[in-house]
Amino acid sequence: MDMRLLIVLLPVLAAASWAGFNIARIALRQLSRLGSR
């Protein structure tokens, strides 16, 4: 693998995983709120 490709992909992957983590956390909170009713 080319090092430049890795340098370009690392921040993109970090941002995508952070967004996915936040979305999953909010979704789980919504589901638990629906289940507690």
Curated annotation (Swiss-Prot):
Q: Which GO molecular function terms does the record list?
A: manganese ion binding
List the InterPro entries.
PSII_PsbY
Reading the lineage from the top rank, the first entry is: Eukaryota
One Gene Ontology cellular component term attached to this UniProt record is: photosystem II
Q: Which UniProt keywords apply?
A: Chloroplast, Membrane, Photosynthesis, Photosystem II, Plastid, Thylakoid, Transmembrane, Transmembrane helix
> What is the protein's membrane topology class?
Single-pass membrane protein
Could you tell me which residue ranges are on the Stromal side of the membrane?
Answer: 24-37
Q: List localization entries.
A: Plastid, Chloroplast thylakoid membrane
GO terms, biological process: photosynthesis
Q: Membrane-spanning residues where?
A: 5-23
Topological domains on the Lumenal side lie at 1-4
Q: Which Pfam families match?
A: PsbY (PF06298)
Record note on quaternary structure: PSII is composed of 1 copy each of membrane proteins PsbA, PsbB, PsbC, PsbD, PsbE, PsbF, PsbH, PsbI, PsbJ, PsbK, PsbL, PsbM, PsbT, PsbX, PsbY, PsbZ, Psb30/Ycf12, at least 3 peripheral proteins of the oxygen-evolving complex and a large number of cofactors. It forms dimeric complexes.
**Listed NCBIfam families:** PRK13240.1
Similarity annotation: Belongs to the PsbY family.
**What the protein does?**
Loosely associated component of the core of photosystem II (PSII), it is not always seen in crystals. PSII is a light-driven water plastoquinone oxidoreductase, using light energy to abstract electrons from H(2)O, generating a proton gradient subsequently used for ATP formation.
What protein am I looking at?
A: Photosystem II reaction center protein Y
| Source organism per UniProt | Guillardia theta
The taxonomic lineage of its organism, from the top, reads: Eukaryota, Cryptophyceae, Pyrenomonadales, Geminigeraceae, Guillardia
